[in-house]
From Swiss-Prot:
Ranges of biased composition (kind: Basic and acidic residues): 175-199
Basic residues bias: start-end ranges: 87-98, 203-216
Zinc finger regions, Matrin-type: 11-42
Annotated region (Disordered), positions in chain: 67-158, 172-224
Full protein name: Uncharacterized protein C18H10.07
Length: 224
């Protein structure tokens, strides 16, 4: 058998790198396999890649060095001249400064005002001046009222009368003790009348039905 297998002719597949029977059926079946087709595709890709590299090398050799230098300088000049566009931010309006207590000028004494120039003007807030005036008017009115004792008495009397008028609707009425025994007598008379009426009432008994009569008669018969 070994001699027989050795006698069969074989060929070497350079794509798959294996030996195959040199018969038309065996060769056709091997070429139709996925492994053989994938190996052929890889070889063709390598050939195509090597051809592209060779073409690039030929182009680089054909271009002179002076041309490459000029292109490089042109590119560098373009990059140097390029500047990023500046962003234009919107202009912000300056905020108005609010007036504070530190900005107000306080008036000084007569000795200090002599040295200050005539153009300098002092400013006092109007609210403080008004409050001081109101306090002064209150003090004057209180002093006047204390000096006139008669007026204060009249005023107190008027206030008391007004309070009495306002509390007129809420006065408590006094109880009359004379009416209390009369109410007790009336209640006693009513209770007596109710007792008499209960005594005079006639009580009507309900008639028994036929079944109840028979039951009661049977009970009486058994007892006898």
């Amino acid at each position: 058998m070994a001699d027989y297998w050795k006698s069969i002719p074989k060929y070497y597949c350079k794509y798959c790198q294996i030996f195959v029977k040199d018969t038309p059926f065996a060769r056709r079946s091997h070429e139709q396999t996925y492994k053989h087709q994938d190996a052929i595709k890889k070889v063709m890709d390598d050939i195509h890649r090597s051809n592209l590299l060779r073409q690039e090398l030929e182009k680089n050799l054909s271009i002179p060095k002076s041309a490459t230098a000029t292109t490089a300088s042109a590119v560098s000049s373009e990059l140097a001249s390029y500047e990023k566009p500046k962003k234009e931010h919107p202009k912000l309006r300056p905020s108005k400064k609010k007036a504070t207590l530190d900005d107000w000028d306080i008036p000084t004494s007569s000795t200090e005002t002599d040295t200050i120039s005539t153009t300098h003007t002092s400013y006092i807030p109007t609210l403080l001046a008004k409050q001081e005036e109101n306090e002064e008017t209150k003090e004057t009115t209180t002093n006047k009222n204390e000096s006139l004792p008669g007026t204060s008495l009249k005023r107190n009397r008027e206030i008391i009368e007004k309070e009495e008028r306002s509390s007129f609707h809420f006065r408590v009425k006094p109880k009359n003790l004379d009416k209390v025994p009369k109410l007790a007598e009336n209640e006693g008379n009513k209770s007596l009348e109710s007792k008499e009426s209960n005594e005079n009432k006639v009580v009507f008994k309900k008639k028994k039905s036929g079944k109840l009569r028979t039951k009661s008669s049977l009970k009486e018969y058994d007892q006898s």
